Amino acid sequence: MSSAIELKKQVVAEIADKFRASKATVIVDYRGLNVAEMTELRKQLREAGVEFKVYKNTLTRRALAEVGLEGLDEVFTGPNAIAFSNEDVVAPAKILSEFAKTHEALEIKGGVIEGNIASKEEIDALAKLPSREGLLSMLLSVLQAPIRNFALAIKAVADKQEEQGA
């Protein structure tokens, strides 16, 4: 076989592995963004631990077939970039959605969330969720409230008994 075919097979395998390992994948059309804007977007994504790559659509379609995500085939028309996140499910959607608000040229087309195909609307809804840390802090404040109220009630009873005893 020729080396070009081997190289393409390696790229397809790489893309398929990224789709398998990724908790969240967002596909965007970046047509119309200049180099400075793309660099800024890549920087924001890199800081959040998100990998942002551009692959040929034909190779990506083959990788999707290998992974079993053929439903995304219609998304891969025109220039596309793919954001892969192996840790945070919300990060790529949030960063790309915020960037798209200030840069109309960036268009979110769809994605994959924990192995399930997601529409543009589902990606937008995911972007509106707080981060994992934000959700954990909300949970902790909800869990602390009853304990705090109980401690305040006990302190009030103790203060009242101290007043009566003095």
From Swiss-Prot:
Under the cellular component aspect of Gene Ontology, which terms does the record hold? large ribosomal subunit
The record lists its disulfide bonds as none
Q: Is the Ribonucleoprotein keyword given for this protein? A: yes
The entry lists its GO molecular-function terms as:
large ribosomal subunit rRNA binding; structural constituent of ribosome
What CDD domains does the entry give?
Answer: Ribosomal_L10
User: What the protein does?
Assistant: Forms part of the ribosomal stalk, playing a central role in the interaction of the ribosome with GTP-bound translation factors.
- What does the subunit section of this Swiss-Prot or TrEMBL entry state? Part of the ribosomal stalk of the 50S ribosomal subunit. The N-terminus interacts with L11 and the large rRNA to form the base of the stalk. The C-terminus forms an elongated spine to which L12 dimers bind in a sequential fashion forming a multimeric L10(L12)X complex.
Q: Which HAMAP family match?
A: Ribosomal_uL10 (MF_00362)
Family, per the entry? Belongs to the universal ribosomal protein uL10 family.
| Name of protein | Large ribosomal subunit protein uL10
From which organism does this entry originate?
Geobacillus kaustophilus (strain HTA426)
Its ancestry begins with: Bacteria, Bacillati, Bacillota, Bacilli, Bacillales
